[in-house]
């Protein structure tokens, strides 16, 4: 409902509250006027048809809240704040909004201005604009389908459902492909209904790469998050027989560029993709017969292809180090190196790449208390703690649904209502539980009743689908642990209060573990990326409580909350202490974590990074982490500089600065304002 749709700027009503300290109301198109409470009541009556007495009651409650914010320093009010508060108050009275969508001219203009800012992987294209316009309509429609309880919690800022527009027609978050499925079956673009051109199982290395790229591209329309390939180098190794280094290099280079230049993702984005590169053969593959050319099972096992797998790893690393035709990073696929049981000093090229472009991620399954795990996108994890078989737990499935709880909002709500923090948190956990299950039911309806995703559920000769929904994770995410602890009176997350952080983590994990056990569903707890949600949810609290009392970071115009249970980026804690603390907390969220270590402008030595990586693996609980250092690139002469350099010293033109936004490296010019605030406050080591 657009409650302000009926409020005209030129209307003035006798009897409005006369205030000496006026509040300015700013509309979405930038126009301003003085706050007049009576307009709220009149608009409510006109749109909902309720009696004037109830409308006045709601109007007074809203006005009281707004002037309380005025006392706390509020000078300017956004129409979105009024809209959200009206919706919340109507829900409390049992009045639901009409299930239609109002689109204003200013909505369209706002999208034209900012449609590339919600996702740092988005660029300005016609496809992106088309997608953003559709997304706005779909998102507004989907809000009419939420339960009153969910809508109220969402409007308040307690919970956040990601990719809301895509709930209508996608639903799934992430997918990790088992390449053996298409290596044995070939490529059927529409699944098993025999529509479209069918490719037989690949017989050559370059064809195997092509079928992997095509499969991920075809899966992308069904996925809101990332697509990935597990055990990439070992799965491709059996196809390399009698090939020269140059031939393999050229095929892999073509694959890497194709993954970036095929804009098949939502809104003409590059595929948000990842590949796992194993430094040593995973234990579960050592005795498995390899699938080779033509989809034939070989007499050799994957352990017999160590040399070829290492060559693939080295070539991909070297291609990434050289960059694209202008010297920029090749952003996708994300490169995830499984480092367990490896001598990291033998992989100097990987750490050279990390020092130059910050692209590699490092994964240690043993630190997540499992034998193996695949990682999707920038943190979602599939450890083999479901059935115990990595072939089932770690590939051919993914993350189906995830939702975020804003811990600062929970703490503020508990204080506002004079309630116990854990009581409010438990309410939100069960609210998320029910919402996730409803969303999963809708995915099943889309897939099996409406046949939206026949490509994803096509079956092999044994009747096993390419994506096994029953093995996918259902996860609860969270935001703002550090600010939550501040609100509760413990100060920002640190060594002194990490026991309180772990207490909250264990409370949430206890619930997901119980659901997993009782429902036989793969529930888990993980660190939400919150690329845009960190700013959006902080903004809701700033609007409700004022900047100071929201405990948000950044500024009042560009606030953000710290991601998950990370130590605040501006905390002066030394790097070793940060590693110890965040490493100790990662195993409490086995469904996905990341530790970001922001390095200074000096060029890190590969040997030093390898040594630090080894220590993190061997002496902490961190199972997924990355080293990040900013670098700037001149768009004219293509010179690269370490650090955030605003102007090229040679050409004197503005440079592009690259860094890791939440999990992946991208141009900071595409970041939203909340993440820009975080970027400015990051402490580098």
Give names to the regions the model predicted:
Residues 650-685:
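Long, charge-rich boundary regions
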Residues 234, 474-487, 506, 660:
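Contiguous, well-ordered alpha-helical segments that form the cores/surfaces of helical PPI scaffolds
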Residues 466-470, 474-477, 668, 676:
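Core of folded catalytic or high-affinity ligand/protein-binding domains
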Residues 21-23, 64-71, 238, 483-488, ...:
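Short, hydrophobic beta-strand segments
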Residues 112, 116-470, 491-494, 498-642, ...:
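Conserved catalytic cores of very large enzyme subunits
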Residues 1-18:
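Short, Lys/Arg-enriched N-terminal segments with co-localized hydrophobic residues
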Residues 18-118, 683-684:
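Charged, amphipathic alpha-helical regulatory modules used
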């Amino acid at each position: 409902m657009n409650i302000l749709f009926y409020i005209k700027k030129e209307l003035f009503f006798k009897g409005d509250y006369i205030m000496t300290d006026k509040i300015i109301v700013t509309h979405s198109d930038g126009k301003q006027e003085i706050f007049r409470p009576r307009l709220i009541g009149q608009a409510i009556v006109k749109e909902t048809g309720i009696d004037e007495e109830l409308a006045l009651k709601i109007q007074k409650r809203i006005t009281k809240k707004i002037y309380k914010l005025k006392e706390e320093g509020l000078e300017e009010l956004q129409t979105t704040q009024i809209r959200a508060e009206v919706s919340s108050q109507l829900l409390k009275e049992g009045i639901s909004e009409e299930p239609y969508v109002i689109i204003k001219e200013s909505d369209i203009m706002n999208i034209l201005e900012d449609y590339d800012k919600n996702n740092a992987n988005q660029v300005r294209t016609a496809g992106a604009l088309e997608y953003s316009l559709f997304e706005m309509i779909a998102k507004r429609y989907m809000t009419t389908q939420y339960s009153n309880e969910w809508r109220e919690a969402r409007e308040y800022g307690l919970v956040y459902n990601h990719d809301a527009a895509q709930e209508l027609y996608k639903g799934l978050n992430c997918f990790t492909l088992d390449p053996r499925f298409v290596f044995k079956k070939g490529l059927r673009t529409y699944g098993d209904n025999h529509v479209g051109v069918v490719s037989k199982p690949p017989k050559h290395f370059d064809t195997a790469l092509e079928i992997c790229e095509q499969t991920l591209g075809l899966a992308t329309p069904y996925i809101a998050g990332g697509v990935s390939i597990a055990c990439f180098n070992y799965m491709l190794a059996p196809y390399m027989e009698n090939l020269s280094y140059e031939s393999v290099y050229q095929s892999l280079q073509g694959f890497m560029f194709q993954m970036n230049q095929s804009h098949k993702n939502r809104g003409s984005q590059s595929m948000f993709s990842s590949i796992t590169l194993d430094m040593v053969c995973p234990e579960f593959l050592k005795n498995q017969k390899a699938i080779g050319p033509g989809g034939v099972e070989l007499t050799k096992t994957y352990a017999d292809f160590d040399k070829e797998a290492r060559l693939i790893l080295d070539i991909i690393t070297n291609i990434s180090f050289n960059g694209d035709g202008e010297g920029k990073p090749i952003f996708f696929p994300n490169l995830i190196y499984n480092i367990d049981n490896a001598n990291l000093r033998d992989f100097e090229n990987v750490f050279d790449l990390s020092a130059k472009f910050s692209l590699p991620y490092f994964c240690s399954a043993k630190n997540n208390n499992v034998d193996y795990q695949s990682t999707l996108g920038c943190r979602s994890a599939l450890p083999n703690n479901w059935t115990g078989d990595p072939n089932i737990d770690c590939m051919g499935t993914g993350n189906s649904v995830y939702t975020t709880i804003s811990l600062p909002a929970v703490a503020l709500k508990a204080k506002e209502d004079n309630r116990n923090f854990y009581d409010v948190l438990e309410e939100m956990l069960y609210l998320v539980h029910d919402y996730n299950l409803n969303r999963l039911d809708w995915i099943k309806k889309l897939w099996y009743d409406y046949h939206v995703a026949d490509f994803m559920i096509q079956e092999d000769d044994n009747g096993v689908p390419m994506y096994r929904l029953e093995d996918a994770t259902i996860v609860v995410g969270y935001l703002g642990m550090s600010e939550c602890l501040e609100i509760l009176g413990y100060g920002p997350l640190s060594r002194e209060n990490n026991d309180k952080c772990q207490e909250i983590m264990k409370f949430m994990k206890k619930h997901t573990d119980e659901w997993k056990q009782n429902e036989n569903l793969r529930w888990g707890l993980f660190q939400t990326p919150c690329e845009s949600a960190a700013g959006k949810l902080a903004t809701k609290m700033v609007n409700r409580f004022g900047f100071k009392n929201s405990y948000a970071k950044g500024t009042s115009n560009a606030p953000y909350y710290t991601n998950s249970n990370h130590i605040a980026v501006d905390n002066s804690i030394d790097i070793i202490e940060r590693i110890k603390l965040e490493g100790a907390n990662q195993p409490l969220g086995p469904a996905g974590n990341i530790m970001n270590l922001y390095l200074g402008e000096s060029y890190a030595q590969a040997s030093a990074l390898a040594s630090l990586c080894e220590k993190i693996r061997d002496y902490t609980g961190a199972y997924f982490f990355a080293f990040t250092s900013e670098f700037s690139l001149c768009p004219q002469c293509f010179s690269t500089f370490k650090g955030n350099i605003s102007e090229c010293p040679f050409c004197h033109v503005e440079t592009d600065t690259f860094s890791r936004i939440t999990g992946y490296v991208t141009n900071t010019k595409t970041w939203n304002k909340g993440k820009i605030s975080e970027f400015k406050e990051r402490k580098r080591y």
